[in-house]
Amino acid sequence: MTEEHLTSQEAAEGEEAVELSLRPQLLSQYIGQGHVKKDMEVYIQAARQRDEALDHVLLYGPPGLGKTTLAFVIANELGVNLKSTSGPAIERAGDLVALLTDLEPGDVLFIDEIHRLAKPVEEVLYSAMEDFYIDIVVGEGQTTHAIHLPLPPFTLIGATTLAGQLSAPLRDRFGIVEHMQYYQVEDLEKIILRSSEVFHTKISPQAAHELARRSRGTPRVANRLLKRVRDFAEVKGEKEISLETTAMALKQLQVDSAGLDQTDRKLLRTMILSYGGGPVGIRTLASNIGEDRETIESLYEPYLLQNGFIVMTPRGRVVTQKAYQQLNLPLPGEEE
């Protein structure tokens, strides 16, 4: 994995198996997202007491925050099966029909990147979610007719990084909507310590804190950096990952004190040096740094906004004083 992708919140090829090994099974084992956990505990308990399928759930927020993990935990807590797919993988309405008709009562259907469903596929979900049935058109010409297929009550869990791209008819059919937020450093420390046990690796509390501080509020990034720092510690012959080795490794990997990587710094530098700090429109910025608009909006901007490196204005993005300080660049008017 290249250095610029170490802090990407998107799952890299081959990481799914690692994430599966680290995945908690129950809400009591799930670290962070306290507001979401409290809500889901109530909703799950109520559904079980009524012996009903849980209402449909929409999880939205930046990548790497545990939306897929939470979907599996919800299914485990309900004691039902989970079938997992993604928006791009469901190419035709018939693919979705096959998934829906294979569900047992109470099962969970998880659709990642649900905002990327094709419109004809999405429309099949409307009646399935609302009234638990689908109409299938069969035959050709004068023999064309619709078959009404009832479905067992089920729970659809949709995950998206771009909730604003969901159509209103689809969004309105989710009874439970939860916003996954960036993790606090103390929660990331707990995740790193838990992951180190799974990896059979010891790490000092100070090193775990430093790693958590630079992990962009994202468990996926924390676990990825832990694996790389472990490599440096093992080569040095350390039996426990030290703070010194952690700092050295992260410097080598070009992850700075705020968790910014090369692309973050390139984005901020471009705004400052080429556009006087902004405002800058998204299309202009994407073209200048060689990234597509969706990547900037879903991977980079949320963290930069959350941590006060940029602000949004009606005319575009503007860097803050904090960004100048992080990059060691003079503020406007202070240039020599």
From Swiss-Prot:
CDD domains, alphabetized: AAA
Annotated binding of Mg(2+), by residue: T68
Catalytic reaction annotation: ATP + H2O = ADP + phosphate + H(+)
Binding locations of DNA: R293, R317
Region annotation Head domain (RuvB-H): where it falls in the sequence: 257-336
UniProt similarity note: Belongs to the RuvB family.
Domain free text: Has 3 domains, the large (RuvB-L) and small ATPase (RuvB-S) domains and the C-terminal head (RuvB-H) domain. The head domain binds DNA, while the ATPase domains jointly bind ATP, ADP or are empty depending on the state of the subunit in the translocation cycle. During a single DNA translocation step the structure of each domain remains the same, but their relative positions change.
Name the record gives this protein: Holliday junction branch migration complex subunit RuvB
Species this chain originates from: Lactobacillus delbrueckii subsp. bulgaricus (strain ATCC 11842 / DSM 20081 / BCRC 10696 / JCM 1002 / NBRC 13953 / NCIMB 11778 / NCTC 12712 / WDCM 00102 / Lb 14)
Gene name of the record: ruvB
